[in-house]
Amino acid sequence: MQRARIKLSSTDHKVLDEICRQIKEIAEKTGVDISGPIPLPTKVLRVVTRKSPDGEGSSTFDRWTMKIHKRLIDIDADERALRHIMKIRIPDNVQIEIQFK
């Protein structure tokens, strides 16, 4: 049987965990095999900018960071289960990628 690999990424880990929980419930309800959610390394994006616009004065900096959390789920590619997964309401700040193997 084919397997579907679902990659989820978001800046909010609580929303990401909630979607993973919903996918896990669907898999248990439909009776398909699931492995995951596997937490992947968090990517930290850093931007450091100078506070002073003209370069005069003391050297003070603003530090901005954004963390991108990722989860990986492998699930059997059952048509009924995937239909239920497609109906999950996914917020705008969550990216989802599905690959079939």
Curated annotation (Swiss-Prot):
* Alphabetized NCBIfam families for the sequence: uS10_euk_arch
Role, per record: Involved in the binding of tRNA to the ribosomes.
Which terms are listed as keywords in the entry? Ribonucleoprotein, Ribosomal protein
Q: Which GO terms describe its biological process?
A: translation
SMART domains in the cross-refs = Ribosomal_S10
Q: How does it assemble?
A: Part of the 30S ribosomal subunit.
Name-wise, this protein is: Small ribosomal subunit protein uS10
Q: Which InterPro entries match?
A: Ribosomal_uS10 (IPR001848), Ribosomal_uS10_CS (IPR018268), Ribosomal_uS10_dom (IPR027486), Ribosomal_uS10_dom_sf (IPR036838), Ribosomal_uS10_euk/arc (IPR005729)
Per the record, its GO cellular-component terms are: cytosolic small ribosomal subunit
User: Under the GO molecular function aspect, what terms does this record hold?
Assistant: structural constituent of ribosome; tRNA binding
Family to which this protein belongs: Belongs to the universal ribosomal protein uS10 family.
Q: What Gene3D superfamilies does the record point to?
A: Ribosomal protein S10 domain
Coiled-coil stretches are: none
Q: Which PANTHER family match?
A: 30S RIBOSOMAL PROTEIN S10 FAMILY MEMBER
Alphabetical list of Pfam families matching this protein:
Ribosomal_S10 (PF00338)
Tell me what organism the protein belongs to.
Methanocaldococcus jannaschii (strain ATCC 43067 / DSM 2661 / JAL-1 / JCM 10045 / NBRC 100440) (Methanococcus jannaschii)
Starting at the broadest rank, the lineage of the source organism is:
Archaea, Methanobacteriati, Methanobacteriota, Methanomada group, Methanococci
